[in-house]
Amino acid sequence: MLRRTLLKGVAATAAMGVCAGRAAAQSVLKIGICIPMTGAGFNAVGRQLQAAIKLYTQQHGDVVAGRKLELTIRDDGGVADAAHRIVQEMIVNDKVEIIGIGITPTALAIAPLITEAKKATFVMSSGASITTTKSPYFVRAGFILSPQSWIMAEWARKNGSKRVVTLVNDWAPGVEAETAFKTRFVQQGGEVIESIRIPLANPDFAPFLQRIRDLNPDAAFIYFPGTQAAIFAKQFAERGLAQSGIKIVGPGDLTTDDNLNDMGDQMLGMITAGPYSAAHDSPLNKSYAATIEKDNHFRPDFVSVSGYDSMHLVYEALKKTNGNTDGDALLAAMKGMAWESPRGPISIDPQTRDVVDNIYIRRVEKINGQLWNTEFETFTAVKDPMKPPAK
């Protein structure tokens, strides 16, 4: 009888140990982040995102709603197939509960996986309107190109540009930027005399620069990703197009804060529309920008603040769900969320799961020997005007 009682006690203790072990295991919350850390043109995206994610977790800790966060960041090189493989491994092998993804091609590649797995996924550096329509579990606290292009068209037309040329890369974000700009510019009574699309990989700008010179528009609306904008702007200036009176306008990518000083004084006076500048005048941003630069030796840009805001979205949603990572529960918590970001006030549109934020008109100016995107006009709480219907 005593032996039986002891055995029961041992069994009960073992069962309690198993339960405790399960509880301890359950308290760890795995977040898998797939971004480009290498690869021509996109490695800067990963660098900015990683710095912002690190800063947010340092400031807010790694325990949320009683669950210890375990972040895994993997490099997809900006390659869609690599991202698909990595995210599949994260879901199946690593048992991650929340996913973070970087640029447009990789986000589109993983959309079917995310929908099937029903994993809440924060999109950090995809500017294409279509992205959040590709999975009901995508949510974006980053940026969208269409509102920037739309606002840029409105501002350019109201400030004297009548005839413009558009020049973009032939991929989803470029086409969307072009479409938004053209739509709004024509609505405002302007004329788009030619729309030029060029290859995404290693484009030769020379013939396109000559074409712009021959057309002699009032302005050229330009959109290129990564480092291509800096190369184009430099060649534009070297070939004398700036002196011809043709203005360059574009979304914020054109004069990204991280690269601006390397672009040189030919960028002075260039006008862009974007959701964030490292020079944004608020106490929160001054602290944020100074800390990022101090810790990493580069300026934060719009990609950086997208990563920072994405982490805020995840942390606050987990607090609302008390640590529950069910995809539908997290998405419900994220929809309609609003907060003060280093970029200014932002929110998540409950219908589209997309960011709503201010779009600032900025001029490149030299202050204390450095080039900055100085904001001088604000369009508040701008939604994506070109948004396709959400799924």
For each of these PLM feature ranges, what is it?
Residues 233-308, 319-321, 325, 368, ...:
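Extracellular/periplasmic periplasmic-binding protein-like sensory domains
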Residues 32-52, 74-80, 167-175, 227, ...:
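Extracytoplasmic "Venus flytrap"
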Residues 29, 338-391:
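Solvent-exposed, acidic/polar segments of extracytosolic/periplasmic ligand-binding ectodomains
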Residues 1-14:
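N-terminal secretory signal peptides and thylakoid transit peptides that target proteins
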Residues 50-71, 187-189:
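Signal peptide-proximal N-terminal region
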Residues 28, 47-48, 63-132, 198-205, ...:
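Beta-alpha junction/loop-to-helix N-cap segments that form part of ligand/metal-binding clefts
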Residues 90, 94-103, 122-124, 165-168, ...:
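Periplasmic-binding protein-like
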Residues 85, 128-130, 136-239, 276-287:
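Extracellular/periplasmic Venus flytrap/periplasmic-binding protein
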